[in-house]
Amino acid sequence: MPAKKKVAAVVKVAPQAGQATPAPPVGMALGPHGVNIMEFCKAYNAQTEGQRGNIVPVEITIYEDRTFSFVLKTPPAAELIKKAAGIKKGTENPATHKVGKISKDQVREIAETKMPDLNANDIEAAMKIVAGTARSMGVEVEV
């Protein structure tokens, strides 16, 4: 069995799917660690090509020999909610000003998408998490 590589750093960035470039935020996050930024951008863009239009967070593990590996996460719940509600951004005052509406089916769909990254045991708990995020953005959730 080969020896394990020593981890030098773990970096999290959230570029647009299929559109990562060496410019900030990717370049600023990886540059100080001496990683080949273009190599990462090409690999990331190839893996996220089918999800264009979404923000796809990625956790990059950088090793001492300047190699890297990365794990793709699911898009942020807020982004999925904005897309489902058809709004550009949430409200500053969710208690009084509602900016959109999503159905229970849309909440379930978002919860199923986010399930691998949420610390919920079942889909119902995941739906509660997503509904809470929606309410905090000023998006009404239909029961």
Swiss-Prot record:
A single Gene Ontology CC annotation of this entry is: cytosolic large ribosomal subunit
In terms of superkingdom, the source organism counts as Bacteria
Entry keyword set: Methylation, Ribonucleoprotein, Ribosomal protein, RNA-binding, rRNA-binding
| Modification after translation | One or more lysine residues are methylated.
Q: Cite a single GO BP annotation.
A: translation
GO function terms (MF aspect): large ribosomal subunit rRNA binding; structural constituent of ribosome
Q: Which SUPFAM superfamilies match?
A: Ribosomal L11/L12e N-terminal domain, Ribosomal protein L11, C-terminal domain
Q: Which InterPro entries match?
A: Ribosomal_uL11, Ribosomal_uL11_bac-typ, Ribosomal_uL11_C, Ribosomal_uL11_C_sf, Ribosomal_uL11_CS, Ribosomal_uL11_N, Ribosomal_uL11_N_sf
Name the job this protein performs. Answer: Forms part of the ribosomal stalk which helps the ribosome interact with GTP-bound translation factors.
Subunit field text? Part of the ribosomal stalk of the 50S ribosomal subunit. Interacts with L10 and the large rRNA to form the base of the stalk. L10 forms an elongated spine to which L12 dimers bind in a sequential fashion forming a multimeric L10(L12)X complex.
- Fetch the HAMAP family from UniProt: Ribosomal_uL11 (MF_00736)
Family of the protein in this entry: Belongs to the universal ribosomal protein uL11 family.
Q: What is this protein called?
A: Large ribosomal subunit protein uL11
What is the organism field in this record? Cutibacterium acnes (strain DSM 16379 / KPA171202) (Propionibacterium acnes)
